[in-house]
Swiss-Prot record:
A single MF term (Gene Ontology): fluoride channel activity
Organism of derivation: Shewanella loihica (strain ATCC BAA-1088 / PV-4)
Function summary: Fluoride-specific ion channel. Important for reducing fluoride concentration in the cell, thus reducing its toxicity.
Family statement drawn from the similarity comment of this UniProt entry: Belongs to the fluoride channel Fluc/FEX (TC 1.A.43) family.
Protein name (Swiss-Prot/TrEMBL): Fluoride-specific ion channel FluC
Amino acid sequence: MNNLIFVALGGSIGAVFRYLISIFMIQVFGSSFPFGTLMVNVIGSFLMGVIYALGEASQVSPEIKALVGVGLLGALTTFSTFSNETLLLMQQGAWLKAFTNIALNLCLCLFMVYLGQQLVFSRI
């Protein structure tokens, strides 16, 4: 039951961060490309790599994993919004933007998970 509270708390924080980051990215870059979703996915992927590596090194409690790994990062990152925005770009005929979005999300997010893990593992 305690882990549910941590997941809920982390989720509420992650949702607020996601909203604020998305609004900020629209203000900076406009809305012609889904930079907000890309940014939250990249940040979340990096943090997931860090949390995973810390967990592997037994330096993170189950409560922190629930708070950050499931709650905060689960609410911060978004595959459904990425999918919807990519489909909208395709439906608008913006194929280059759609495939750029797919490539950036996939490549950057995988790299950021790796980078987060390596950062932690190199310090342990």
